Amino acid sequence: MPVISNPAVEKSTKDEGTASCSVRSRKRKADVAIFLQDPDETLDSLEMTKKKQYQDRGPWSNEMTCKSPHKLIPTPEKEEHEPNPTNYSHFASLRFSPVSVSPLPRLGWANQDDVWRNMLNKDRIYLRDKNFFQKHPQLQPNMRAILLDWLMEVCEVYKLHRETFYLAQDFFDRFMATQKNVIKSRLQLIGITSLFIAAKLEEIYPPKLHQFSFITDGACTEDEITRMELIIMKDLGWCLSPMTIVSWFNVFLQVAYIRELQQFLRPQFPQEIYIQIVQLLDLCVLDICCLEYPYGVLAASAMYHFSCPELVEKVSGFKVTELQGCIKWLVPFAMAIKEGGKSKLNFFKGVDIEDAHNIQTHSGCLELMEKVYINQALLEEQNRTSPIPTGVLTPPQSNKKQKSDRAD
């Protein structure tokens, strides 16, 4: 991959094209005031003022001081729900129950059960294959990790949102599963084109085509990107609206911090907590084995490592026993994150303070993967020498517990 040298990014004008009827719009509302500022005259002072206000009051609210977010939320009222008729047979090996009760609160703009069923259907329709590299003998799984790490860096340079990156990751993985014998020299073209498509879907002001070509240091021309764009969209069947990992995580964290009578329209969770958990997702997505799990399961399992089982079950609709396999798989990644230290919220020129956590950052995940491999080897060795697997604790057997009680 070429080394990125922080080029001067031009401000892109708003794309005037309308989205296809088969692809729902993912555009955000523009903060017009920010984009009307003269960056050479007023933007610097505006950012300094906002940053000072942020430091004085904290992100969104003073609830940041609470270490256990579940303590802030009253238990929602349970309602009777219709069984979900969706067929989950292709996830049978993961032992997920076919019926998942909606954890969403009452919504003023839609039926919460319909929204939840649609979210679950996304994971059923948009399938991934962790073994797709078997179709490409010239490629190795670590090449995917290098590519995704580079795409994170591109996103940070152009101030693209996390959702844009995770869309690109999904497009890349699903497209590669439809292909055979892709050569190494085409991998970067597929990756940057996936990001190009994702940016046009998600960003208000996506970078220009020539900027995507420029960031590859001339390795991918504009014509090659436009031709590959059509190939990718056709082979994906124009299915370009998955429920990404970070989309699931946003919903779960919002449910964790939602208060009564709120309309579930704007984020209500602390940014600092958000970036700690999303760093774990950024790291684990570099491993091809993440494709073994549905995106919702990955997001819920990541939350498990930063909260309590009761909260995870409440906000995700999954039982911890259903998440156990993914939780254990994430243990080496969580250990590496802990060893690397706490993440800090980054601020970007031209990006509103309240949106800073949504900008995809490049935090050296590729280097952390070396620690992950070391942790995986250590845990495997412990599992061989210990009868009790590490990662997830299990209660003692009832007969042993009775003997222990009698001895006392």
Swiss-Prot record:
Residues 1-23, 56-85, 385-408 are annotated as: Disordered. Phosphorylation by CDK2 triggers its release from CDK2 and degradation via the ubiquitin proteasome pathway. Keywords: Cell cycle, Cell division, Cyclin, Nucleus, Phosphoprotein. This is G1/S-specific cyclin-E1. GO terms for molecular function: cyclin-dependent protein serine/threonine kinase regulator activity. Coiled coil: none annotated. Essential for the control of the cell cycle at the G1/S (start) transition. It comes from the Eukaryota. The modification Phosphothreonine is found at residue 394. Belongs to the cyclin family. Cyclin E subfamily. It is found in: Nucleus. Interacts with CDK2 protein kinase to form a serine/threonine kinase holoenzyme complex. The cyclin subunit imparts substrate specificity to the complex. It holds the Pfam family Cyclin_N. GO terms for cellular component: cyclin E1-CDK2 complex; cytoplasm; microtubule organizing center; nucleus. PANTHER family: CYCLINS. GO terms for biological process: cell division; G1/S transition of mitotic cell cycle; positive regulation of G1/S transition of mitotic cell cycle.
